[in-house]
Design a protein with these regions (language model features):
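Extended alpha-helical targeting/anchoring segments
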Residues: 1-330
Length: 330
């Protein structure tokens, strides 16, 4: 574990030297992990980052073949509504116009977390275990990718059941979802402008499907690009520090919204909604740590949530939070 200044300087040092490394940064940036890839053998960490991995595919064969069974025990709507109302009041008063409200849901699942890692399908996956933490995630969301001096980010906001007739048209024309997506795109453009120049939106509001064990979801995404400022070219630690927490999992305006999240959620998010990624000596790939299961003692909890705006309906947001509790094993 590294302290905040340490992880920034360590990442900057590794970048200047072209040293390959993995990073796992928690939401509060209190317990960041930055490790050379050559050091990973001594840690219980497995990753799959857009095709880059540190394990043998055949290892999944050691687990028994069985059908996934997951039971959700979500909080009551009344508990959710109390938190939602606090967010809505702040938005009515102009303190925030987008806030990502999250909860942890107790679940019962017949797979271990490491088994979930090996058997799940996702663009980004991570299994992590140490003396205090054990979690697995299977995230569809890119944080930033850096290639040849260009940064790309792909904010995801807007979700619908893909099996609904006309789902894509409904999603793209939903006033609340469109407003939420536009807000997070604008927020991430602003975040990129801190570390980049020539920031532009290459693609706005396109959709893609993700598979779950309950069916398919359709999500709305955009692509934003910028060129890294020359003074930050070999300072990945500073780039990440200036952009965290990820805009898509907090809201806007960022500073005020972070305070409202703190007073509303009443618990630390920890590694959930942080970021992780890999630097290969030249380029960087990273993901937002969502679709997240953690184990505390004998109990498992699934973390999920969604963006709240003035257009939000509490029951729909509650249902979306529960709908996002899935494991992509099929």
């Amino acid at each position: 574990m590294a302290s905040e200044p340490d992880f920034i300087e360590r990442m900057n040092f590794y970048t200047r030297r072209g040293i390959r490394f993995l990073f796992i940064i928690d939401y509060e940036m209190e317990f960041p992990v930055v490790l050379k890839l050559s050091e990973l053998n001594g840690f219980c960490i497995k990753y799959f980052i857009d095709g880059v991995k540190n394990y043998d595919d055949n290892i999944s064969n050691i687990f028994n073949k069985k059908e996934l069974n997951i039971q959700k025990r979500p909080i009551s709507f009344e508990v959710y509504k109390k938190a939602f109302n606090n967010v809505a009041l702040n938005q009515k008063n102009g303190n925030s116009y987008l806030l990502n409200l999250t909860f942890k849901t107790p679940i019962e699942i017949n797979f271990g977390l490491e088994e979930i890692f090996y058997k799940s399908s996702s663009r980004y996956k991570l299994y992590f275990k140490d003396e205090e933490n054990e979690f697995v995630l299977f995230s569809p969301e890119t944080f930033i990718n850096i290639t040849e001096g260009k940064i790309f980010t792909y904010p995801i906001k807007g979700t619908i059941d893909a099996n609904i007739p006309g789902a894509e048209e409904i999603l793209l024309n939903d006033k609340k979802e469109k407003a939420e997506h536009l807000t997070v795109v604008d927020l991430l453009r602003n975040d990129l402008n801190i570390v980049c120049k020539d920031v532009k939106v290459n693609r706005f509001c396109f959709t893609y499907k993700i598979k779950t064990n309950f069916g398919e979801l359709l999500q709305m995404v955009s692509e934003i690009e910028g060129r890294v400022k020359p003074n930050l070219m070999y300072r990945l630690g500073d780039i990440l520090f200036n952009m965290l927490p990820a805009g898509s999992i907090c809201g806007a305006p960022k500073r005020q919204t972070l305070e409202i999240i703190k007073e509303t959620e009443l618990y630390k998010r920890g590694y959930y909604t942080g970021v992780f990624g890999i630097y290969d000596g030249k380029n960087l790939k990273s993901s937002v740590m969502i679709r997240f299961i953690e184990k505390k003692g004998d109990d498992c909890f699934y973390r999920s949530g969604g963006g709240i705006t003035v257009y939000s309906d509490a029951k729909k947001e509650y249902d979306e939070m529960v709908e996002k509790i899935y494991v992509p094993i099929y």
